[in-house]
């Protein structure tokens, strides 16, 4: 994946005396590319990491870019203009952090979209790593509070001028590129959670159930997937796929549409049919969840990459309970974000 170090990096220039307001001086940005990924253990990517997450909050009509406004938040403690974000709490994923912190700071409910990347900068004796998404405001109301006393909704060019920090400006510029090619469909492509060992299962493999960890993964997928406001759920035939998204279906109050074309067997025996079924989900528009197996997922994504505008040249990963957030415009893949696990990052 682009801009994703595979080993712990040293804190950039950390003197032990730097504050949040010094982040431009020694900060780094990892915002390049429409292919983004979160490491399996993001807290170990840098030394003494403080993890945080947030979003570029926006409102307006993406089909009319001139109507888009973004939220600039004023923090009285720092007397600065910045983006909504906050630190990870125990027992939550980065996606959950982004949604919770936005609600706490601004009062707004959001629907997350594209992962923009991350910024990295030293604060005191730690390395602060902040992941940013785009986040469409879908409800709620701002009430001034101790953390944020004012919010200004501005067109992007005015927001860029108001922002205090260059790092935040670069996040905004990345969001602007995403707004210029708006998503008209998004698929949350989930691999089923962990199931009982195949070698110790004597029955029909389609009936092999989730194990204890798999059941926890399926429960933790609910807040993660809900952050993107899915409208419908599809699943391959195996029960481990259906059971992975069953808690989400209960939360949404909807049925899971089961189709054999989303499974590994279809990818082997009827690749054309499997591609057609996935294309139907794209053409339905909006946001959908598709739960599948580990064999078909890399194949479908590679096919989408070849057909779209997003080249993916490296190995396509699909850990159990992982999520690929796939973004489409006019039926073509324009963005892909890999979230390797729904489990807490701390």
Task: List the predicted regions and their residue ranges.
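Short beta-strand scaffold segments in enzyme catalytic cores
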Residues: 53-57, 322-325
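Nudix hydrolase/Nudix homology domain
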Residues: 2, 18-19, 79-80, 143-197, ...
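Active-site-adjacent alpha-helix immediately C-terminal to a catalytic or transition-state-stabilizing loop
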Residues: 275-334
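A short coil-to-beta-strand element that immediately follows conserved catalytic motifs
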Residues: 109-117, 255-259
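Acidic, metal-coordinating catalytic segment for phosphate/diphosphate chemistry
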Residues: 2-54, 60-62
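Active-site-proximal alpha-helix that buttresses catalytic centers in soluble enzyme cores
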Residues: 86, 97, 184-269, 298, ...
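Unchanged
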Residues: 88-111, 119-170
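Conserved Nudix-box catalytic region and its N-terminal flanking loop in Nudix hydrolases
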Residues: 65-109, 201-208, 213
